[in-house]
A protein has these predicted regions:
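Catalytic Walker B motif of ABC-type/P-loop ATPase nucleotide-binding domains
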Residues: 101-105
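ABC ATPase nucleotide-binding domain signature
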Residues: 18-27, 41, 76-77, 139
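ABC-fold ATPase nucleotide-binding domain signature/coupling loops
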Residues: 3, 59-88, 106, 110-113, ...
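Conserved H-loop
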Residues: 129-135
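C-terminal portion of ABC ATPase nucleotide-binding domains
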Residues: 55, 64, 120-129, 143-186
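ABC ATPase nucleotide-binding domain helical subdomain, centered on the C-loop/LSGGQ "ABC signature"
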Residues: 1, 9, 16, 34-75, ...
């Protein structure tokens, strides 16, 4: 089911327009930053693009370029670091305004402060109903989710909120402790 309709009732194009992906290994296209952002929403205004770039914590970099949104993106985004590419593809996903946002280790190449700011921006994507599916090895990326599924060897070993899993899942506790624990939970 997707909403109140059977997923089989949707065409592939309809599903593609409803779902946005941000993968750990992301894709930037040869062209300009603006052209790359328009892949998310070809009707987006410059104002909307700048807002998405701001939410994705990449706006200061873009504003540092003389040609701003018209800055050239080389093949495979080779003129950007891994973290910069991730933030640009996150901005593109924000522009799409999809009903389902799938983030697969999408902040793995950014520092913890940037990750936290992006997570805060993701949590405020409420202009329209949105389901967020976050796949991550970092607990800090998923700790605020309504439902967390813990996998080991491809099998579900635990499920619940962060608080539930800290109390009841040894594997989750081990991962949590190995990543430094706490995460400003005080």
């Amino acid at each position: 089911m997707l909403g109140e309709h059977n997923i089989k009732d949707y065409t592939l194009d309809a599903l593609n327009s409803y779902i946005s992906f941000v993968l750990q290994k992301n894709t930037l296209f040869t062209g300009t930053i603006r052209e790359n952002m328009l892949w998310g929403n070809n009707n987006a205004t410059d104002e909307e693009i700048y807002e998405a770039l701001k939410k994705a914590e990449i706006l200061p970099l873009i504003e540092s370029y003389k040609d701003k949104l018209d800055h050239e993106v080389l093949i495979d985004g080779k003129n950007f670091s891994g973290g910069q590419k991730q933030r640009l593809t996150i901005a593109r996903a924000f522009l799409k305004k999809a009903g389902i946002l799938i983030l697969d280790d999408s902040t793995s190449a950014v520092d913890k402060i940037t990750e936290k700011n992006i997570q805060n921006a993701i949590s405020t994507l409420s202009e329209h109903p949105i389901t967020k599916i976050i796949i991550s090895q970092r607990i800090s990326s998923v700790k605020d989710c309504d439902n967390i599924i813990v996998l080991e060897d491809g099998k579900i070993t635990a499920q619940g909120t962060h608080k539930d899993l800290i109390a009841n899942s040894l594997l989750y506790q081990e991962i949590y402790n190995s990543q430094g624990g706490d995460y400003n939970e005080k």
